[in-house]
Amino acid sequence: MDLSYETAPAGVTEVSAATLDSIKELDHVKNAALYRTRQASNAVYYLNTALSGGNITGVDDGYFDTASYVVMKGRGFSKNDYANARRVALIDESVESSLFSGESALGKTVEIQGYPFTVVGVVTEKDSYDLVINSMDDYYMYAHDDSQGNVFVPSGTWPVIFGYDEPQNLLLKADSTDTMATEGKAAEEILNSNLNVTD
């Protein structure tokens, strides 16, 4: 299958490297990453077993550090994986348990939307933290449910699999939970000021 693709279609705004760098330079931001995600309902298969739920996430090279994931088994994505949009995937422990029933997932092929991807690693979250939630806006900003599991692919493969239906998301790692909301708002202002919107 051909995994080449055109650039983003007209009207789809991508976050530039310069904009991401500006966000990373905020006083209390330790790291930032871009990603796209969608629910994986019946989109991921291993042989005849479907992942029922969970998320598929296309990630950049800063995502795993920013999201505090570590590789437990196998390897993470390499520069070559990102540069060449290689069909490789990382999964979390929940997906390994659901799809592989106690077998090692390493080197096995899963299908994502009909495209074959080789599982090169299994990841887990390394940090837990207590969020400071002061409003409903803060709650919705931080709310997510990873209980069904996560499948990760290099960001370059995302448009081939899913097109540009999902917007880019920004993930920030602040230096403390006390600064998360203020740095999130500052990043929002930078993103909005760099939108190229025309009528």
PLM region spans:
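Structural beta->alpha junctions
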Residues: S4-E14, H28, Y45-S52, V122-K126, ...
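A general structural signal for well-ordered alpha-helical segments in protein cores
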Residues: S16, L20, T57, M180, ...
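Mid-to-C-terminal secondary-structure elements
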Residues: G62-G76, R87-N196
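Soluble mature domains adjacent to a membrane tether on cell-surface and organelle-surface proteins
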Residues: N80-D81
